[in-house]
Amino acid sequence: MSFPTHEQNGLVWLTSSLLSRYGQTVSHGFSTRKGGVSTPPWDTLNLGPGRGDSPEAVLENYRRFCGALDVPMERAVLSKQVHETTVRLCTAADAGKGLFASRDYTADALITRETDLPLVVFSADCGIMLLYDPVHHAAGAVHAGWRGCAAGILEKTVQAMADTFGSDPAAMVAAVGPSIGPCCFETDDDVPEAMTAALGAEAADLPEEELRRRCAAFAFSLRRGEGGSWILCCCGRPVGEEIRTERA
C-alpha cells in the first residue's frame, strides 16, 4: 500500500490512512528529507541529534515537523536505540528528553498514555511500527529492525501496552512505516537464520506474499478484530531522494 503524502510550506511527510482515522485523538507522521534547514550531508530535514549536524538546525527541523503535525516539540521524547527489546513507559517526566535533556535510558520502543507527549523513533534501513489503542488512548512507537523483531520487540511492546494500559491486541491498530525492501537488502547468513528461528523453518520456502502475511502476524501479534494491522511498504532505495532509509 502507498503512503498518503502531505506538504506544508515545503515540508513533506507521510502518514498511514489507518491511523489517520483516529486523527482527532492521535497525531502521527513519517518524516522525509524535505522541508528542513540542514546543509549537506544532512540535507535537509535531519531529525537525528548528535550526528554532526548543527544543533540549531536540528531544533529548527523539529520545530517545523512538530508544527506540521500540531504536536509540542518541547515535550517530544526521543528513543535511544540499541537494537534490543527494552520498552520504555514514557511519562510527563520524560518530556523533552533527547532534545532539551539527556536520555537516561536506552529503549527501542516507547509507549505512553500521556497527552501531548510525542514519541520519536528513528530508522535507517529498519522498519518503524506505530501502535494505537483507541479504547484506552494509548500509543506506542517501535524501532523494529531484524534483530529486534527476531528477539520479540514487537510482541513485547504489545504485551507491555496490555499489561500497563489494559490494551486488547484485537482492538489495537498498527502501521509499519517506510523501510528498505527485499529488492535492495542484501544480508549475511545471520539475518535469515535469526528470522527462520523466529518464523519457523518453513518460512524460507514460502511465496513472498504468504511470508509477508506471516511476518505481519508474527510482528504485530494482533488478532483480526476491530483494529488489526496494515502494512505500508516503501523501499527506501528507489525513493532515496525523499526518505532517509539507508545507512551511509
Predicted regions and their residues:
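Active-site microenvironment for binding and transforming phosphate-containing groups
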Residues: 1-248
